[in-house]
Curated annotation (Swiss-Prot):
Comp. bias regions, Gly residues: 21-35
Subunit structure: Part of the 50S ribosomal subunit.
Name this protein carries in UniProt: Large ribosomal subunit protein uL15
Gene that produces this protein: rplO
Family listed: Belongs to the universal ribosomal protein uL15 family.
Record has rRNA-binding as a keyword: yes
SUPFAM superfamilies the record matches: Ribosomal proteins L15p and L18e (SSF52080)
Annotated HAMAP family: Ribosomal_uL15 (MF_01341)
Species lineage: Bacteria, Pseudomonadati, Pseudomonadota, Alphaproteobacteria, Hyphomicrobiales
Organism for this UniProt entry: Rhizobium johnstonii (strain DSM 114642 / LMG 32736 / 3841)
Pfam families (UniProt xref): Ribosomal_L27A
Length: 158
């Protein structure tokens, strides 16, 4: 059997039902929507409405909150940094910081800082200055002969 001889199983595909194309088609006029009412109109579905039953979003209790002071770090893996070094976009001899990562195209925006995670391997000996790094990431960088400097978070205004 060749690739061009493959066919769908019998009855597995259906042709599209053309609605509202005359009474003889069997699905003309109302097109399977019944007569009148909200569901016969366009733009029907009411999200979260369960027909008078208490909807799920009201049956379940409220939980948690959004912390407006939470730090939003941009996450970068060691693999991404190593790829940028291999491609010549990052210089391993200079200090790697948020600005250098942005200039190299590793990250798009800085937000509240950069956090390095240990996904992948790092071969280059780099000096990196970031807002955060996971313990395995720090261990991998130091094992490769590099150093990690963590920036202290700015003090909250009082």
């Amino acid at each position: 059997m060749k690739l061009n001889e493959i066919k769908d199983n019998e009855g597995s595909t259906h042709s599209r039902k053309r609605l509202g194309r005359g009474i003889g088609s069997g699905s003309g006029k109302t097109g399977g929507r019944g007569v009148k009412g909200q569901k016969s109109r366009s733009g029907v579905a009411i999200n979260g409405f369960e027909g008078g039953q208490m909807p799920i979003y009201r049956r379940l209790p409220k939980r948690g909150f959004n912390n407006i002071f939470a730090s939003d770090f941009v996450v970068v893996s060691l693999a991404r940094i190593q790829t940028a070094i291999d491609a010549g976009k990052l210089d391993a001899k200079t200090t790697v910081d948020a600005a250098a990562l942005k200039a190299a195209g590793v990250i798009r925006r800085v937000k509240d800082g950069v956090r390095v995670l240990a996904d992948g391997e790092i071969k280059a000996k780099i000096t990196i200055v970031v807002a955060g790094a996971s313990k395995p990431a720090v261990e991998k960088i130091e094992k490769a002969g590099g150093t990690v400097t963590l920036l202290s978070a700015p003090a909250a205004a009082e």
